[in-house]
Amino acid sequence: MPYNLKQLFQKHNVKGLSINSKTVKENDIFFAIKGQNVDGNDFINEVLNQAVALVITDNKKNTIIDDKVIYVEDVQVALYEAIEIFYPKKPKNLIAVTGTNGKSSVVSYIAQTYSLLGKKAASIGTIGVEIFGCDNLINDVPELTTLDYLSFRKIAHNLAENNIEYLAFEASSHGLNQARLGEIKVNTACFTSFSQDHLDYHHTKENYLLAKLKLFTRHLFKPAYREEFKGDTEHSTTAYILVREDASTGSTSKLLLEAKFGKMSTEYLLQGGLAILNSDIAEIEFVKDYLRNHNIKFITVGKKGDVQITKINGSLKAQNINFIFNNRECSFNTSIIGSFQASNLLIAALSIHYIGFDFNKIIEILTQVKPVKGRMERIGNTNIFVDYSHTPDALEKALTELKNVKLRDSRLNVVFGCGGNRDKTKRSLMGQIAARLADNVIITDDNPRHEDPKLIRAEIISGIEKADYTEIANREEAIKYGINNLKQDDILLIAGKGHENYQIIGDKKLPFDDAEIVRKLMSLRGKAKP
């Protein structure tokens, strides 16, 4: 049936939009969307009993007869239309980051750097919503790396309403594959790393990579061209119209450029978006060819990148990073450890520079950027680190970094497990990596969910072969064992959970925080600051 959403909003006094029957509120419009695992149409009767204003569905098989139920051709299209009416605003400058590892770090570095440049900025991702330059405005954020499109636009609208102009956010392969970013377009898109993960969902590494690449083909701004503006405006007598073709629809949009974005943003809008890639990705040549075939501009960062990292001097407390930019040797110091963080920091710097900020100023500011919670996070004044490394590549990088900076006669210890109901093929590989790089391996549980944790541990142990290991199911006891066996100058890495403050066992989500456990145990020993 024909419908006019604006009129429906007014007629039914709509207060909000919802796609989740568990969180729908009185006077919301509920959009009954069929998802990967759950069908919103199964909950129509339930939400009608919760005094929703309307239900919109495209399932013609529904037999529900109710004045509040409206049938449309495409419920997803109706939702997008409603979002544009209800949550039309978003920060003007958007940066998206994808990659197997490094997403959370890069979006945080971007938002922190903007803030240090005097701008109000925010980041969205695995850790949640971080806001810099004003009070935290966001509550009740769903726990997904990439939010559903409605949640994302609600948050983006809230940020824009509070004058936040700069937003960096994570784009996961699941989110990209499921089109959770809707029609969002970004100024720069970053690719931090690529290695095995999520094969339980994507099945093959090729599918996983192609899902990542959707960020660049679907969501990067396409190049635009100038069109003379006829007539004066209150903003500028030299203003002109920006004309941009939307590749997905073939339509064009016109924006009064200087009035809306300011002169600083002119050139990148005319040029289109930029892809910033880690040159150390094994599949980098495939990625570059793919982007060339789609006429997407890119720049690479890394040991063999356009921005070339030439030397890194690191310790347990800091590192000095040397690189070449525009044929000029540059360097900066950072308290963020791990050589892989060098490319993450420079990717963040380039994404901001592309929008128009001075590169030298950005590099000066990078020295003030702080580590991200649960990302090679050093606990107090100890040699104990908590890291989110839950993939083979991330675990290998974390252990390699610590092995390279430890004293010759000291030992490197690791506590880790693997998540249940996730990619099983990586478990033995992670066991193999731990046994090869660490002197002491402690296998424990990490969000077993609905799998038998003993079987998960056995799969990890199958990769260890003849190396020594200790198996302790209880994660707190495993951490305690690791701490108690540390000798002078030894290092302990607690891997897999990072920032997480829970342990998922079956359907229960129990409080658990690796860093807090360490602080508690070390405080009892009197050897760390709480």
UniProtKB/Swiss-Prot annotation:
Location of N6-carboxylysine modifications: 212
Keywords tagged on the record: ATP-binding, Cell cycle, Cell division, Cell shape, Cell wall biogenesis/degradation, Cytoplasm, Ligase, Magnesium, Nucleotide-binding, Peptidoglycan synthesis
Disulfide cysteine pairs (residue numbers): none
Molecular-function annotations in GO: ATP binding; magnesium ion binding; UDP-N-acetylmuramoylalanyl-D-glutamate-2,6-diaminopimelate ligase activity
Enzyme class: ligase
Catalytic activity: UDP-N-acetyl-alpha-D-muramoyl-L-alanyl-D-glutamate + meso-2,6-diaminopimelate + ATP = UDP-N-acetyl-alpha-D-muramoyl-L-alanyl-gamma-D-glutamyl-meso-2,6-diaminopimelate + ADP + phosphate + H(+)
Positions that bind ATP: 99-105
Entry EC no(s): 6.3.2.13
Pathway the protein contributes to: Cell wall biogenesis; peptidoglycan biosynthesis
Domain RPE1 insert residues, every copy: 221-269
Residues holding meso-2,6-diaminopimelate: 422, 446-449, 496, 500
Main location: cytoplasm
Protein's job: Catalyzes the addition of meso-diaminopimelic acid to the nucleotide precursor UDP-N-acetylmuramoyl-L-alanyl-D-glutamate (UMAG) in the biosynthesis of bacterial cell-wall peptidoglycan.
HAMAP family on file: MurE (MF_00208)
Family affiliation: Belongs to the MurCDEF family. MurE subfamily.
Name of the protein in its database record: UDP-N-acetylmuramoyl-L-alanyl-D-glutamate--2,6-diaminopimelate ligase
Lineage: Bacteria, Pseudomonadati, Pseudomonadota, Alphaproteobacteria, Rickettsiales
Gene name of the record: murE
